[in-house]
Amino acid sequence: PAESAEPAEKAPVVDPLAEFRRQMSALPGQWYVLHTYSGYERRVATDIMARAENFEVEDYIFDATVPMETVIEIKNGNKKKEVSRVRIPGYVFVRMDLDDPETSDKVWRTIKDTPAVTGFVGDRYNPVPLTFEEAVAQLGPTPEEIAAKEAAAAEATAPESGSGTQIATGGQ
């Protein structure tokens, strides 16, 4: 006798961009963009966080990030290799609080004096923060990343051939 298979409960579909927006809106500080030497982006991000701790401004500098993307490179004619690379070469995004007049100069100088940083995007002496929408557009998942995650999730939930599902037929 065949047992009826109960339909598996589907996890609620979560829009990755909406989830990212929700997470971003809960974070303190504003996002600023730094110019850096190309090729030094990851090192600058790491150095900024170390300097924030060393100069005791970690309560004002919350995050330094370099948007990355995964691409497939084809080498030697047919060898495919997944490579992670900087999405926007020469730029680092820093989430910080420059609203306190007593500490803003120290925070600004900590960032500006980091090796390989050439300056802030915007006014030379008064950094201009990104709007929320600009920050989401630059730091959020790209449509390609969303599609890849959805494809991977669909592939993970699809039953494999020969996965033990049996079909009972009436006969004999």
Question: Where are the regions that the model predicts?
Answer:
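Acidic/Ser-Thr/Pro-Gly-rich, low-complexity N-terminal segments
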Residues: P1-A11
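Acidic-enriched and Gly/Ser
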Residues: K10-G170
